[in-house]
């Protein structure tokens, strides 16, 4: 990411979009730390005197999406399965997995939900996220059948219900993810192509 931001001034419209998104962050000196343990499905563990449940729900936002549930406290940490007050973005998908993840959260019935982005929330925020993806899936499928590109679909689908959510340009990435699911593609979408589409969607006029 640091290299991309450094090259952004030479990348035209895409570079300008990168700088708007990431220019205020300092990525220098960040080192990737690999996990010491992994799991799949579900795992229980203790942290101090608290029992935690780890629940795999990806791929959706990313391949490794995981919920962390503290059942005794009725608190759930969603990671980036929940963006409170902003459009989510399905980098890995499929969108149907994200909908299933929302259903899993609702079945756990937590009192407090700590999202990956935004303030602490309640289950109403999860229901709204689920409704967003269900609506988007249906609308995108119609336009996919009509032969529209993801960008054309993004420009034609109304998301007025979520007008107060930020980062509306992410819509095109979510639509591209639905298209990939409908076409049977299993690899994550190309990030550079996705950023270019977001930049185009955000372009005035």
Positions of predicted regions on the chain:
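Metallo-beta-lactamase
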Residues: 1-142
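Sec/Tat-exported extracytoplasmic proteins
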Residues: 5-8, 109, 140, 144-148, ...
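Short N-terminal secondary-structure initiator segments
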Residues: 9-26, 59-65, 71-73, 77, ...
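Short flexible/disordered coil segments
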Residues: 25-35, 39, 114-118, 171-191
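Glycine-rich, flexible loop/turn motifs
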Residues: 35, 41, 83-85, 161
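Charge-patterned, long linear interaction tracts outside catalytic cores
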Residues: 37-38, 43-50, 55-59, 63-64, ...
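C-terminal regulatory/interaction regions
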Residues: 146-205
